[in-house]
């Protein structure tokens, strides 16, 4: 049995890609997209029809060019998501514009709009996860959306405070970023030789997983942003793992046994009183890595969103 199939025995495997051909090849349960992945996929010739449809939608929407671009951008994200859903049995994650990361109300409005666009294409909201950055405002927006039956995936998650606040808000799923945590520490204090058990990104997800299970939070933990297969194998047993096509390929090519590393704890603890906004901001702010990586992640997604909009504007 190859390692990918071995992991699938214990963990739901999710494809971290906007490339539909890769998704079909590796047969994941779910798929995640973001502006960076959509920008990459939009440059591939085989997806030209999805872009043309989004452009036509933008023109039909009318208004200023800026409004047409915004409409086309939302439609493109939904077009890719709907196309991906034809190749997977589960859900696709579609991201809310990162520039709304500090605006609860506009994030809610955008999420409802994306769900509406999906429903116009015959896709039920039970097959969609709305991705939001795990800022305080993003977490509050997700809490409201969950009450409306719109499940959310909280991304750019780097601190324990972010994870705990998401669980307390009743968020459906979180995506703690293993690789970007590893990158930050590796640039400052390289782990040499590399020992996966000491990898700060792996340790972060393990701690979150254990805490959620010990306190009976139903929020799904989906490890994300991997740099090497060792990180993935060390988190086998995590609820879900979202993996890029290049690492899915590596795992599929290795014929080695896979051992489950994460197992729900039998120890149970009472849940603490939910964090206030002040407590969340203080706790998150104590983690220099998390503060830096969250703000950087939002900026980078916003840059790629603008590039995607420029690509669409040139065609309108």
UniProtKB/Swiss-Prot annotation:
- Which EC number(s) does UniProt give? 2.2.1.2
Q: What Gene Ontology terms for biological process does this UniProt record contain?
A: carbohydrate metabolic process; pentose-phosphate shunt, non-oxidative branch
Q: Which reaction does it catalyse?
A: D-sedoheptulose 7-phosphate + D-glyceraldehyde 3-phosphate = D-erythrose 4-phosphate + beta-D-fructose 6-phosphate
> For this UniProt entry, which residues form the secretion signal?
none
Which residues does UniProt mark as catalytic?
Answer: 131
Q: Where are the transmembrane segments?
A: none
- Compartments, as annotated in UniProt: Cytoplasm
Gene Ontology CC terms, in alphabetical order: cytosol
Q: Which Gene3D superfamilies match?
A: Aldolase class I (3.20.20.70)
Q: Which InterPro entries match?
A: Aldolase_TIM (IPR013785), TAL/FSA (IPR001585), Transaldolase_1 (IPR004730), Transaldolase_AS (IPR018225)
Keywords from the named record: Cytoplasm, Pentose shunt, Schiff base, Transferase
Q: In which pathway does it act?
A: Carbohydrate degradation; pentose phosphate pathway; D-glyceraldehyde 3-phosphate and beta-D-fructose 6-phosphate from D-ribose 5-phosphate and D-xylulose 5-phosphate (non-oxidative stage): step 2/3
Q: Which family does it belong to?
A: Belongs to the transaldolase family. Type 1 subfamily.
Q: What does this protein do?
A: Transaldolase is important for the balance of metabolites in the pentose-phosphate pathway.
Spell out the subunit comment: Homodimer.
Please state what the protein is called: Transaldolase A
Q: What is the lineage of its organism?
A: Bacteria, Pseudomonadati, Pseudomonadota, Gammaproteobacteria, Enterobacterales
């Amino acid at each position: 049995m190859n390692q990918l199939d071995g992991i699938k025995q214990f963990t739901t495997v999710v494809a971290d890609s906007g490339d539909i051909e890769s998704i079909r090849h590796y047969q994941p349960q779910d798929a995640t997209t973001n502006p960076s992945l959509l920008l990459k996929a939009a440059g591939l010739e085989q997806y030209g029809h999805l872009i043309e449809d989004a452009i036509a939608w933008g023109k039909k929407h009318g208004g200023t060019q800026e409004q047409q671009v915004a409409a086309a951008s939302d439609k493109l994200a939904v077009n890719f998501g709907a196309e991906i859903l034809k190749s997977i049995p589960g859900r696709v994650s579609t991201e809310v514009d990162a520039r709304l990361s500090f605006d609860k109300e506009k994030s809610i409005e955008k999420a409802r709009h994306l769900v509406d666009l999906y429903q116009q294409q015959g896709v039920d909201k039970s097959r969609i996860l709305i991705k939001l950055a795990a800022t305080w405002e993003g977490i509050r927006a997700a809490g409201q959306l969950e009450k409306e039956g719109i499940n959310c995936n909280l991304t750019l998650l780097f601190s324990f405070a972010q994870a705990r606040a998401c669980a307390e808000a009743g968020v459906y799923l979180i995506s703690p970023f293993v690789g970007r945590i590893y990158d930050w520490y590796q640039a400052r204090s390289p782990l040499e030789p590399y020992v996966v058990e000491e990898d700060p990104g792996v340790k972060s997800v393990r701690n979150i997983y254990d805490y959620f299970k010990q306190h009976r939070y139903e929020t799904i933990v989906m490890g994300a942003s991997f740099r090497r297969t060792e990180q993935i194998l060390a988190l086998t047993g995590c609820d879900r793992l979202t993996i890029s096509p290049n690492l899915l390929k590596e795992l599929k090519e290795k014929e080695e046994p896979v051992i489950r590393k994460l197992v729900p704890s039998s120890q149970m603890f009472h849940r603490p009183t939910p964090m206030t906004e002040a407590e969340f901001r203080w706790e998150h702010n104590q983690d220099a890595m998390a503060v830096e990586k969250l703000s950087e992640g939002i900026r980078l997604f916003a840059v790629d969103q603008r590039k995607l909009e420029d690509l669409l504007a040139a065609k309108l």
